[in-house]
C-alpha cells in the first residue's frame, strides 16, 4: 500500500487483528510465529509474556526479511498471559484445562499481562508490558459446565474470552479492557506512533 510504511502483524489471532482494525489500522500481512508458549520452570507471568512476545517478533522477523515486499516493514507481536498470583494459567485446549481455569478464577481477582513487541524498519526492538486486574463473580457448576460446553474458551489464555459469554462473569476491571482481549490499543498505537508509523492514515475512510 502506497503512502505509508508497511505493517506486519506476527499473529494469527482474529482478536488482535480485529482490535487493530478497530483503531483504523490495517496490517499489510499476517505472519503468525510458531513459538513454544510453555512457561519455563519457575517463570513469573510478566517475564513469560515479555519473553514470548520477543520470541514471536524474532521468529516472524526471519520470515519477513526473506520477503522483498515486506522487508523494512514495521512488525508487531504480542503475547497474553493470565495469572492468579504467580501461577500462569494455560491457553486452554482441553475441557479439563478450561474447567480447572474457571474454578481457579471463580470469585477471585486475577491479572492479565500482555507484552507488545514492535520491530522498527531499522531493526530496533521496542517493548511494553501492560497489566489489567480482573475480578470474576463466583461461578456455579452450571456456569462452568455451560461455558465449557460453549467451546468459546478454546485456545484462550486463562480459558475464557472476555469479549464473549465470559464477559458476564466479570465483576470488575482495573486497567485496559483491550489488554484482556489480547492487544492493549492505547499502548500499541502509542508505540507505533512514537516510532513514526502513521496511525491515523486509515481514519479518513473508517466510516
Curated annotation (Swiss-Prot):
Taking the record's annotation, the residue ranges forming a coiled coil are: none
Q: Name one GO biological process term.
A: nucleotide metabolic process
Q: Which UniProt keywords apply?
A: Cytoplasm, Hydrolase, Nucleotide metabolism
Site for Important for substrate specificity, residues: 15, 80, 163
* Subcellular location as annotated: Cytoplasm
Listed under catalytic activity are: dTTP + H2O = dTMP + diphosphate + H(+); UTP + H2O = UMP + diphosphate + H(+)
What does the record give as EC number?
Answer: 3.6.1.9
What residues make up the catalytic site? 79 (proton acceptor)
Under Gene Ontology molecular function, one entry of this record is:
dTTP diphosphatase activity
Which cofactors are required for activity? a divalent metal cation
Example of a GO cellular component annotation carried by this entry: cytoplasm
A Pfam family cross-referenced in the UniProt record is Maf
* Alphabetized InterPro entries for the sequence: ITPase-like_fam, Maf-like
- Give the matching PANTHER family: BIFUNCTIONAL DTTP/UTP PYROPHOSPHATASE/METHYLTRANSFERASE PROTEIN-RELATED, BIFUNCTIONAL DTTP_UTP PYROPHOSPHATASE_METHYLTRANSFERASE PROTEIN-RELATED
The UniProt similarity line reads: Belongs to the Maf family. YhdE subfamily.
Function, as annotated, reads:
Nucleoside triphosphate pyrophosphatase that hydrolyzes dTTP and UTP. May have a dual role in cell division arrest and in preventing the incorporation of modified nucleotides into cellular nucleic acids.
This chain's protein is named dTTP/UTP pyrophosphatase
Q: Could you tell me which species this protein originates from?
A: Rhodopseudomonas palustris (strain HaA2)
